[in-house]
């Protein structure tokens, strides 16, 4: 099965949004890789989960985090091993650790011994639950627009015995009215995996201002995808949880820091995975 690693052509974000000419060599190559990926889903557990739930979904990320090749037959497990060995999947696993470290530092640096951590695009919220388990005084508010992700987060909280410390609500991170309704205001805001799926720079820039003018958290923990040699393969072959192409926006971390500075935040730490695909940052209010 083709691995579809680095693309010889570094496609821009605008190019990734457009379909390729139907008979161009690149279109034919990615079409063949997409067909191979769908066929591989009959054998590889990771590809099956990705095609069934989306390659940006909680179930797929859980499979990546587990990092245990699974499949029907030895060939299926080998296909799965290659999937899990992608640079992007390596980066996913590394940023989970980096995000946990940044959130743990944020909880420890909070001005209160019982910090409230708000994840505004929580999904199943694996990072937050790991921090709550290690920091008995911390509490969490988990918000998302996806009811299925919130149901998964509730179930996870119950399994871990953390339901009394976790509040789950359906809301958009970019809804200023929803931010104004958050009470009490969180001490730490986590925005992990949020910026890459929203393509409008002005939306994110305004979001930092909205955060500062509404809940004004002491700290913000974020991640941003800055470069990825597999970005075109992901956009042409993978599908997201809505069945649409996985077109992710790459941004320099400097852009995030500039918008944060304008809203009154400065970096306390910036970490990178070993491939330099992601940056994980912790911001503090100035």
Question: Residues of each region from the PLM?
Answer:
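Conserved SAM-binding loop of SAM-dependent methyltransferases across substrates and taxa
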Residues: 124-137
């Amino acid at each position: 099965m083709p691995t579809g690693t680095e693309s010889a052509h570094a496609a821009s974000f605008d190019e990734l949004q457009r379909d390729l000419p139907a008979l161009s060599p690149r279109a034919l190559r990615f079409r063949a890789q997409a067909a191979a990926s769908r066929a591989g889903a009959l054998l590889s557990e990771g590809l099956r989960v990705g095609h069934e739930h989306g390659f940006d979904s909680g179930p797929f990320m859980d499979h990546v985090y587990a990092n245990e090749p699974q499949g029907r037959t030895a060939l299926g497990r080998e296909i799965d091993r290659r999937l899990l060995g992608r640079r992007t999947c390596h980066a996913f696993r590394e940023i989970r650790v980096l995000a946990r470290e940044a959130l743990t530092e944020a909880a420890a640096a909070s001005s209160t011994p019982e910090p409230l951590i708000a994840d505004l695009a929580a999904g199943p919220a694996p990072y937050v639950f790991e921090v709550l388990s290690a920091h008995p005084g911390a509490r969490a508010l988990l918000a998302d627009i996806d009811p299925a992700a919130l149901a998964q987060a509730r179930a996870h909280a119950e399994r871990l015995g953390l339901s009394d410390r976790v509040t789950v609500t359906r809301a958009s991170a970019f809804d200023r009215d929803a931010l104004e309704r958050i009470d009490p205001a969180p001490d730490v805001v986590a925005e992990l995996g949020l910026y890459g799926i929203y393509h409008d720079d002005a939306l994110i820039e305004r979001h930092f201002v909205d955060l500062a003018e509404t809940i004004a958290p002491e700290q913000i923990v974020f991640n941003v995808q800055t470069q990825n040699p597999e970005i075109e393969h992901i956009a042409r072959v993978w599908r997201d949880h809505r069945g649409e192409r996985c077109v992710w926006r790459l941004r320099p971390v400097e852009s995030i820091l500039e918008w944060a500075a304008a809203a009154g935040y400065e970096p306390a730490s910036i970490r990178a995975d070993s491939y330099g695909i992601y940056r994980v940052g912790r911001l503090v209010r100035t």
